[in-house]
């Protein structure tokens, strides 16, 4: 979607609706839906602080749960846990989140689990040295940009998350694409000559960030990396 928007020179799409109501989708039994909604909302208010803490840390609370159950995407899904996973677990993200109030993504959501980081100073790319607001990360971003690529530095995840949002790149897609390229590199399918001097090993933060910027600029190996895994497989197999 980001590529389509860029090519059409579209910055954003704004949708207007008359208003937000509980029966926007013309439910069959509105009273029953409202009753269940009241019950679910009450359970969330009473239990969330003691269990998932979604209102405090959002979906990032899943990091340690997935790691404990050997389900955390690690090194392009080769593993399900890692000894350094605590470096990017929910306690770490709680220390970064600065907006303590619930910040829902939709009007009326009682969970309001979206979080953000204020005044974060960017270190690379076109916004280097500037302080910005970074949305999230949610679990999918923390795991996709983090453990799946062998990255256990929260600051790398935050900066990559910011630039993906800024460039119009899906964090999940980029995390998976990068992990695929990293495994190809470590297995000898890719090398510095093919990547334009980048060493795409698991956990190599500087080169991973540089590749993301090259994708956004449409430069060198970034032109290939930005095409997604399906096309990359074809290119790597042929060449």
Regions found by a protein language model. Give the residues of each.
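Intrinsically disordered, low-complexity segments enriched in small residues
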Residues: 1-239
């Amino acid at each position: 979607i980001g590529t389509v928007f860029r090519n059409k020179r579209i910055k954003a799409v704004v949708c207007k609706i008359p208003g937000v109501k509980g029966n926007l989708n013309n439910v069959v039994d509105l009273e029953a839906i409202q009753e269940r909604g009241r019950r679910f909302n009450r359970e969330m208010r009473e239990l969330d602080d003691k269990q998932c803490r979604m209102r405090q840390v959002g979906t990032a609370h899943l990091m340690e749960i997935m790691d404990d159950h050997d389900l955390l995407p690690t090194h392009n899904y080769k593993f399900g846990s890692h000894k350094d996973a605590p470096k990017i677990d929910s306690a770490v993200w709680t220390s970064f989140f600065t907006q303590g109030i619930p910040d829902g993504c939709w009007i009326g959501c009682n969970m309001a689990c979206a979080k953000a980081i204020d005044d974060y100073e960017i270190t690379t790319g076109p916004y280097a040295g500037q302080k910005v607001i970074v949305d999230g990360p949610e679990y999918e971003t923390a795991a996709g940009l983090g453990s799946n690529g062998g990255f256990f530095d929260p600051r790398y995840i935050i900066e990559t998350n910011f630039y993906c949002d800024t460039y119009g790149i899906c964090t999940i897609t980029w995390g998976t694409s990068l992990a695929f390229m990293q495994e190809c590199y470590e297995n000898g399918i890719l090398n510095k000559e093919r990547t334009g001097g980048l060493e795409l090993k698991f956990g190599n933060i500087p080169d991973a960030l540089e590749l993301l910027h090259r994708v956004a600029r449409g430069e060198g190996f970034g032109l290939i990396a930005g095409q997604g895994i399906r096309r990359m497989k074809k290119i790597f197999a042929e060449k």
